[in-house]
């Protein structure tokens, strides 16, 4: 099953005949495989680990798939005939992807941008670097828009630091430095949920997991308070993981940072799991994911292991936590968030 955006790309497959094609911000389907009927080769970069896993299972000699915020170093200087960019949900990420595209596109090569027509893509002309020609709308179907333009001249060298903001953050554990790449959630002050969590941290020791680490706020606060922790940080988003690693470096701290689709890539048992899980909108699908997170995280805890999360108070966590863990406490709450704490039997 192809997403609407991917279906629009396939409608325009004549553009890719016998070409080497790069896809940036790859979505969760098998478009890469379908394009091989037209293109010479397809290389895909997924920023979401779940999206990567779906295509990685289909890899073959002319189809390569990678996860990360950039292509591997072996692709430095490698250029393609066409680059497809899936317009990101975080609009601030779009110029980053366009500059990355420019660094991997032949001069006069084609950039294709596709996205939901209500997802911000209509502002593409304001976001494209001036090394490209003006984008032209080529298709409007499946509630999506497709734009194309050409690389007229070489753009500036791609440097990650051009897309990084760094700032100090006051936490209950003291001042910390946060490194935030575009597209990663940031308020440049401690959000109310994380503040509630950090203000009521239990004493921890041993192996601890920060689920949905984002830019590393909770990670660094934990290590500031308890530097002997064996901390592991997971997220599904490549920009978040890169931000977390940079945040750790800036604070001269160390932790294991790696991608995981939920808790699927996590191995072994933990003494504690601490999280401000990224499930906020209250949709049925989100509630289901949150429910799965509770059940799976209990299985990753050692006996007597500590589990503590902060969540929007309207999300129905309580019944699931009671069902999975039995008893639980609410050490603190405010008008927006609740802190849930329990210990595995």
Curated annotation (Swiss-Prot):
> Which EC number applies?
2.1.1.172
User: What InterPro entries is this protein classified in?
Assistant: DNA_methylase_N6_adenine_CS (IPR002052), Mtase_sm_N (IPR013675), rRNA_ssu_MeTfrase_C (IPR023543), RsmC/RlmG (IPR046977), SAM-dependent_MTases_sf (IPR029063), Small_mtfrase_dom (IPR007848)
Q: Which GO terms describe its cellular component?
A: cytoplasm
Where does this one sit in the cell?
Cytoplasm
Matches recorded under SUPFAM superfamilies: S-adenosyl-L-methionine-dependent methyltransferases
Enzyme class, first EC level, given as a word: transferase
Q: Which GO terms describe its molecular function?
A: 16S rRNA (guanine(1207)-N(2))-methyltransferase activity; nucleic acid binding
Does this UniProt record's set of keywords contain S-adenosyl-L-methionine? yes
Catalytic activity field: guanosine(1207) in 16S rRNA + S-adenosyl-L-methionine = N(2)-methylguanosine(1207) in 16S rRNA + S-adenosyl-L-homocysteine + H(+)
Concerning CDD domains, the annotation shows:
AdoMet_MTases
> Which Pfam families does the annotation name?
MTS (PF05175), MTS_N (PF08468)
* Keywords, ordered alphabetically: Cytoplasm, Methyltransferase, rRNA processing, S-adenosyl-L-methionine, Transferase
What's its job?
Specifically methylates the guanine in position 1207 of 16S rRNA in the 30S particle.
Q: Which family does it belong to?
A: Belongs to the methyltransferase superfamily. RsmC family.
- Self-association and partners: Monomer.
Name it.
Answer: Ribosomal RNA small subunit methyltransferase C
